[in-house]
Amino acid sequence: MKQAAIIVVLDNDKRDPEVFRQELENVAKETVKLTDCVFCVAVKEMEAWLLGDENAIWEAYPSAKKKFLRDYEQDGICDTWQILANTVYAGGLSELQKKSQNRYSEIGKAKCEWADKIGVNLVLEENISPSFRFFINELEMRIASE
């Protein structure tokens, strides 16, 4: 029988990522005895993983506004999805909020579109998001051991 692994990927908006990961690992040690378990925490939001590859953004959105990325700190605790909205959405965050009337379902649709368009252009080795790198490294280690 092949070795099983559980890989959990989740957003982390407010917690210290290392403390949060350790809390999750402690719970896993107590409850999941025989399975390899990895927690990959997207620091702040999953959009941080998209912002980790600027070339993928430019390929998906050639008219993206680079000025919004100048001061972005990768995996920093900041308004990540809002920065992405200002970068790629026509009219930026304010236009998206106005058009969606701040309804999460409409904002969620925009986020899904960004993930689809940018995601297909991501180059795994070039993504500079530390939390994304951790995720990829964990996957690669498990694939290599097969």
Map each language-model feature to its residues.
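C-terminal accessory helical subdomains adjacent to catalytic cores in phosphodiester-
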Residues: 1-7, 12-146
